[in-house]
Amino acid sequence: MKKKLFGTDGVRGVANIYPMTTEIAMQLGRAAAHIFKKDHTRRHRIVIGKDTRLSGYMIENALVAGICSMGVDVLLVGPLPTPGIAFITSSMRADAGVVISASHNPYQDNGIKFFSADGFKLPDTTELEIEKLIFGNEIDSLRPVADEVGKAFRMDDAGGRYIVFLKNSFPQDLDLNGLKIVLDCANGAAYKVAPAVLEELGAEVVTLGVKPNGSNINAGCGSLYPESLAKAVKEHGAHLGMALDGDADRVIFVDEQGQEVDGDQIMAICSLDMMKQGKLAHNTLVSTVMSNMGLDIALRNAGGQVVKTAVGDRYVVEEMRRGGYNLGGEQSGHMIFLDYNTTGDGMVSALQLLAIMQRTGKPLSELAGVMTALPQVLINVRVASRQDINIVPEIARTVKAVEEKLADTGRVLIRYSGTEPLLRIMLEGQDEAEITGLAQEIADVIERHLGVRTKEQ
């Protein structure tokens, strides 16, 4: 059955426009609260956290009303990274967690996603169950009487608990003394906790994006804008820079020379180091089809392997749990270290990389050399609808011709974004000029038929 509200990462849209309205938020709260009430012999509670978007306040209030109306209590943790909410949900033995965030999207957008009691994202079956209640006629009859409604409580120490958790993921015999780090928090959920963690471990921290005002989240800052980070690293003579996104579930780095180090390179560094220590489960890394072929080559040369999934960190986690793997992630900077957390965690990922730097004494530029990336070009086409490109003859012919031209020296990957109205065209090959021209050729044809193109660097 096709979902009506949930996408690849919860429910998402422009705030105050369907489906990201207070009415839908309240209905989501009601339906989820009913489903997560496993029995009626105890009080149930759901954790709610958010990022720094202005619309987070109204959505939070609507969710609280819906959840409490079904007889479930709420723990409000305020602005906290998405992985922090997953951690609090599990550690507080809550029945579920809710994140109000649109991750790396601009402030006008917002979203609602759920974690189950164990801190993992919901399976499709549970999301469909929630939607069935929302669009059915049953839920009104399930409401409890007045003396059984839930209460909302503020949890003032959630940030402190998450800081301790993060520090405990860093080796006890190491510290960050002597490291100068430029940290960009994207004016998002990590603006308090991330600097505190690095400073408490001994680093000298230069902060960017730590003054949220409700409308500046991800605005020219964070993991999608490494240029400003690179500039700051050079200006301050830092050893490296790291940038989180709005909900801090992803991270990218800039080395001491100002060169970007993306998720593929971070995974290569960490997985090869874990293999040397015998800590990479089954000598296997899980990544998505968007990852660079250079990552596969690096792992294969070291005696490991890469297992590929569809795009989306939830699919990476599902494969990791299915196969018993402990490291996976995406080129975008989502990385999951299942030994520590249940979802992508930018700070956990950063601390694992920083530990390798401190233990080996090598600069990030040298560590990144373990992987040689093949040239990749990514072009986005904004579309009005998700039409099957294979049924548009001119598009299908163009794509086939490009694939035949690349043959075994590269690949073409075209997919719709799971969170935005974009068709992503990715080409990979040995000659950057050639694949740039070929990607442009495909994009021009798609633009004529389906939408407006914007280029992503």
Swiss-Prot record:
Enzyme class, spelled out: isomerase
Catalysed transformations (reactions): alpha-D-glucosamine 1-phosphate = D-glucosamine 6-phosphate
PROSITE patterns: PGM_PMM
GO molecular function terms attached to this record: magnesium ion binding; phosphoglucosamine mutase activity; phosphomannomutase activity
Modified residues (Phosphoserine): 103
Active site: 103 (phosphoserine intermediate)
Keywords per UniProt: Isomerase, Magnesium, Metal-binding, Phosphoprotein
Binding-site residues for Mg(2+), renumbered to this chain: 103, 245, 247, 249
Entry PTM: Activated by phosphorylation.
Family membership noted in the UniProt record: Belongs to the phosphohexose mutase family.
Protein name: Phosphoglucosamine mutase
